[in-house]
Every structure is written in C-alpha cells, then in structure tokens.
Amino acid sequence: MSTKKIFEERLQELEAIVTRLENGDVPLEEAISEFQKGMVLSKDLQKTLQAAEKTLVKVMQADGTELEMDA
C-alpha cells in the first residue's frame, strides 16, 4: 500500500480534528498544533478534489474525441 494516505483516511482525520477543536477541551498549544495539521489536510484534500474534477470534466465521445464540459 502507498505510504500516502488515501483520501477517505485523510478526510476522517480532518473530521476528527474538527470535532476535537469544536469540543473546546483541548489545551491551547495542542489546539494550535491540531489547527495547523487540519489546515494542511484541508489544502491537500482540496488539491485532490480539484485534480479529480479536472479528470472528470473531460468525457470521451463515441468517436474518441474529448468533450469539454462546464465545471
């Protein structure tokens, strides 16, 4: 298996961070660290989604030509 976590695992990790921070019972230093980790995960997930969107925007027509669709 790849050393890079799959999208779903990273999303679950981000959701767990958000939950911990929303609960408000995290010490300040840990909250800052978790927030930073969450921001990195968020940016990485966004990049993954954008790449997937670019891939899905192009559809092959029956004759093999690409049809560019509005995103």
From Swiss-Prot:
Localisation per UniProt entry: Cytoplasm
Main location: cytoplasm
Keywords: Cytoplasm, Exonuclease, Hydrolase, Nuclease
Molecular function GO labels: exodeoxyribonuclease VII activity
Keyword Hydrolase: yes
Pfam families in the cross-refs: Exonuc_VII_S (PF02609)
EC identifiers of the protein: 3.1.11.6
Coiled coil location: none
EC supergroup of this enzyme: hydrolase
Reactions this protein catalyses: Exonucleolytic cleavage in either 5'- to 3'- or 3'- to 5'-direction to yield nucleoside 5'-phosphates
Cross-referenced InterPro entries: Exonuc_VII_S, Exonuc_VII_ssu_sf
Cellular component per GO, a single term: exodeoxyribonuclease VII complex
SUPFAM superfamilies linked to this entry: XseB-like (SSF116842)
Assembly and oligomerization: Heterooligomer composed of large and small subunits.
Similarity annotation: Belongs to the XseB family.
The protein's name: Exodeoxyribonuclease 7 small subunit
Organism, as annotated: Streptococcus equi subsp. equi (strain 4047)
Encoding gene per record: xseB
